[in-house]
Amino acid sequence: MNSINVKIKRIRPEKGNPLPRYMTAHAAGVDLCADLDQELVLEPGERTLVPTGIAIELPEGYEAQIRPRSGLALKHGISLVNSPGTIDADYRGEIGVIVINHGNEPFVISNNERIAQMVFAPFTRAVFQDVAELGETARGEGGFGHTGR
């Protein structure tokens, strides 16, 4: 299993909120917790930015992906609007999670509640070549369900 060193800063250290952590030995992502002064009620169809109380410094060549938690999605219809969200290596601000309630009931988010997961990944940057034509393939321009439903 590979690992990288990630510097982490607590935005409000006096609150003593937990740092992200892996919940199982083989988990790909760490859980991110809400950093709230009071409970937040998310009505059906409503979205909001939830602070996490942390900022990170990633090594060059890496990104962090913010993803929904499957249990919240299945049980409550809670997801992320921009999924996955991307944290770039040069971003130093507080990580915020844009949460949306796709469920039928209001959803209460409490301080320290696990609201999303963060996965670290290397990335490759493209060097674009401006061309007049692209190579032919059997698929061609077919897309958006052209192979079936």
Curated annotation (Swiss-Prot):
Lineage: Bacteria, Pseudomonadati, Thermodesulfobacteriota, Desulfuromonadia, Geobacterales
GO biological process terms on file: dUMP biosynthetic process; dUTP catabolic process
Disulfide links within the chain: none
UniProt gene name: dut
Keyword presence, ATP-binding: no
Catalytically driven reaction(s): dUTP + H2O = dUMP + diphosphate + H(+)
Keyword field: Hydrolase, Magnesium, Metal-binding, Nucleotide metabolism
Residues annotated as binding substrate: R69, S70, G71, N82, T86, I87, D88
Protein name: Deoxyuridine 5'-triphosphate nucleotidohydrolase
Highest rank taxon of the organism: Bacteria
Record flagged with keyword Magnesium: yes
One Pfam family in the UniProt entry: dUTPase
Stated role: This enzyme is involved in nucleotide metabolism: it produces dUMP, the immediate precursor of thymidine nucleotides and it decreases the intracellular concentration of dUTP so that uracil cannot be incorporated into DNA.
Cofactor(s) required for function per UniProt: Mg(2+)
The family this protein is said to belong to: Belongs to the dUTPase family.
Broadest EC class assigned to this enzyme: hydrolase
Molecular functions (GO terms): dUTP diphosphatase activity; magnesium ion binding
The enzyme's E.C. designation: 3.6.1.23
Organism this protein belongs to: Geotalea daltonii (strain DSM 22248 / JCM 15807 / FRC-32)
Pathway: Pyrimidine metabolism; dUMP biosynthesis; dUMP from dCTP (dUTP route): step 2/2
